[in-house]
Amino acid sequence: MKRMLISLILLLATLFLLGAKTVQVPGPQGSLSCLIRLPEGFNPNTERCPMVILMHGIFSSKDLNPMPALAKGLAEAGIASVRFDFDGHGKSDGRMQDMTVEREIADAMAVLDFVKGLPYVSEIGFLGHSQGGVVASMTAGRLAKEGKDVPKGMVLIAPGSVIKEACQGGKFFNARFDPKDPPEFVRCWGFMKLGREYLLGTQALDIYGTASAYDGKVCILHGTRDGIVPIWCSERFKETYGESAEFILIEGGNHMITRHRKEVVQRTTAFFKSVF
């Protein structure tokens, strides 16, 4: 117990020194666990800075890379970030089995409303990885269609729009199912549950049509050795956004960009510095 207490104190001290703060944001499905990271030396009481909302992929969390590395790089560039766990993921409320893309869009909207209420935030950007890229793009598109303020810029890393085709084909990772009548849930890798509502609802998503309403600047990054999300997903997003988007292939990069993280962080920070 004593060792655990010491470890907790050290962790909290480290987060404080790094300008990080954990907050709970009320979401449609329950509490969303968020981690705010501010630039080193930044005083939120007297200064203002831009903030990027980071959205992780399916079966991931705010604490798994590439999210922490991106938050660190942004902070070093003078840009704040908030990364959060979608409902049913990480430390947020809810069950993985109940997760849907529409619910994740609602989560993103809730975090956006929270960020808009922070007095030290000057401008807002979106970043999404994998399914988080789908959520980020559709959230930005919904905001535009509703005539609301949209993010100043957006980075999509291996945006996983292939989830629609996967659900339509009855094959999601190693799970097999009848796409017209899926079971209550399927298991991916034996322990990750995807519910019937996700398997049916994802088939009907108008991903690119919704995303197309956003006309801000977009940076799309995709590893050439991504074995999970095919490159054509990013190519479709590039076609959707046209001249307002730049599409960059990360040579040799896999889906999690494990060996090319420095390049991804550098390109991400350079993009946001150019739009803020």
PLM features: what roles do these ranges have?
Residues 58, 85-95, 160, 253:
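Short beta-to-alpha linker loops that shape the active-site pocket of alpha/beta-hydrolase fold enzymes
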Residues 18-45:
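N-terminal cap/lid segment of alpha/beta-hydrolase-fold proteins
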Residues 59-71, 86, 232:
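The serine-hydrolase catalytic nucleophile loop
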Residues 32, 134, 139-141, 145-236, ...:
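The alpha/beta-hydrolase serine catalytic core
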Residues 71-93:
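Conserved alpha/beta-hydrolase
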Residues 62-63, 89-119:
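Catalytic nucleophile-loop/oxyanion-hole region of alpha/beta-hydrolase
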